[in-house]
């Protein structure tokens, strides 16, 4: 996953926009965030499908189908606290025995720092870091080849 743009949408993004991001990130989910990147909710491809079947148009806002209380974890949690909150029964409740639950890991400001997948046994099977896009880069002379390559990577 290149950056958080593939896993987050604003509440006003359209259902079509959300489906496009879900198609790219292949998690089956996007997370709804406010203007400060704080988590507001989550939308799965199933939420969108059910919304369309209920008569929603793909041009409607994603907030109309978003779940406002998704399962989350915090980066400050240790393994014991994680295991107390993300139990196999919680995972199975959301995705059954054979599925994986995609969970945003939040910082203390409720911003997504990574996304993990947990299986029906409650075991973490993958983690993807969420890299914030760079808004400003200050380059001071003498960066050399390596510095210029790093800047290109940051700005790319």
Language-model-derived ranges and their functions:
Residues 1-3, 15-36, 40-67:
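Soluble cytosolic regulatory domains appended to membrane proteins
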Residues 2, 131-134:
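Short helix-loop-beta connector
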Residues 5-6, 15, 78-79, 123-130:
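Short glycine/proline-centered loop/turn elements that form peptide/ligand docking sites
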Residues 8-27, 33, 52, 56, ...:
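The conserved cystathionine-beta-synthase
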Residues 24, 31, 38-54, 99, ...:
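Short beta->alpha transition motifs characteristic of CBS
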Residues 71-74, 148:
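Conserved ATP-binding/catalytic motifs of P-loop helicase motor domains
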Residues 140-155:
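N-terminal Rossmann NAD(P)H-binding glycine-rich loop of SDR-like oxidoreductase domains
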């Amino acid at each position: 996953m290149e950056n958080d743009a593939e896993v987050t949408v604003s509440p006003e993004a359209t259902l079509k926009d959300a489906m496009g991001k879900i198609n790219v990130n292949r998690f089956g989910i996007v997370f709804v965030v406010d203007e400060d990147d704080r988590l507001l909710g989550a939308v799965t491809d199933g939420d969108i499908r059910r919304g369309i079947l209920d008569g929603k148009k793909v041009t409607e806002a994603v907030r109309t189908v978003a779940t406002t209380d998704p399962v989350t974890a915090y980066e400050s949690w240790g393994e014991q606290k994680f295991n107390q909150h993300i139990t196999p029964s919680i995972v199975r409740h959301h995705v059954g025995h054979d599925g994986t639950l995609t969970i945003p890991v939040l910082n203390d400001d409720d911003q997504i720092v990574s996304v993990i997948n947990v299986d029906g046994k409650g075991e973490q099977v993958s983690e993807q870091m969420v890299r914030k896009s760079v808004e400003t880069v200050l380059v001071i002379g003498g960066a050399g080849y390596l510095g210029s390559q790093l800047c290109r990577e940051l700005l790319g």
